Amino acid sequence: MKHSSGLIVFDMDSTLIHIECIDEIARLNNRYTKVSAITEAAMRGEIDFAESLTQRVACLEGIKESDLESLFSPIPFNPGAKELIQALQAAGWKTALVSGGFTWFANRVQAALNLDAVVANQLEVADGCLTGKVLGDIVDAQVKAEQLQQLAGHWNIPPDRTVAVGDGANDGLMLKAAAVGIAFNAKPALQAIADYSVNSNNLLEILGCLKQSELIEPVI
């Protein structure tokens, strides 16, 4: 019988949830058109992710932190998110979220799904408002790949028992670092390097990919 446990690392925006949080925040101060255009270019790999994030976050200056709640009540999960995580956890898998998005949202996703770990960018807040800056190092493509490897090491999970799921060009290195890389409703650049592609919004289809890879046979 195959070893049943492993590590699966998810992107957050447009993967576990069906929105791009930074774009939705930008709606709060009428900067959606500008910010979403930069997001699209970054996800296609046309501009550097860290540079794009700095540009986009600068557009959010002055937004009240309390107003973010309206974007996440309820949390906009993609279909099958909870069922997928529950199935994997029941099979002994570690589940993690590694996102170029923000801890304000990622921590809430972690709590709702009972994920084992979360890594994301932290928005700077002063006097209850966003400053337009990110605290600390930016979680970019390289950091995502490194975090997958570090989490696997932390839990003593063999490299050949690791899976990464994402949708954008900044997930490419993470998918390559994993034994199995799954592109979820992804941009063409990511689908081109992924082991499997799911072209629907139902996260439960990821189970089919894992069964094909034999990573979760015969547990689920």
Swiss-Prot record:
Needed cofactors, names only, are:
Mg(2+)
Sequence positions that bind substrate:
E20, R56, S99, G100, K144, N170
Q: Which CDD domains match?
A: HAD_PSP
Pfam families membership? HAD
Domain of life of the organism encoding this protein: Bacteria
Membrane-spanning parts = none
**Which positions are annotated as binding Mg(2+)?**
D11, D13, D167
Q: Which PANTHER family match?
A: PHOSPHOSERINE PHOSPHATASE
Q: What is this protein called?
A: Phosphoserine phosphatase
Per the UniProt record, the source organism is Idiomarina loihiensis (strain ATCC BAA-735 / DSM 15497 / L2-TR)
Q: Which gene encodes it?
A: serB_2
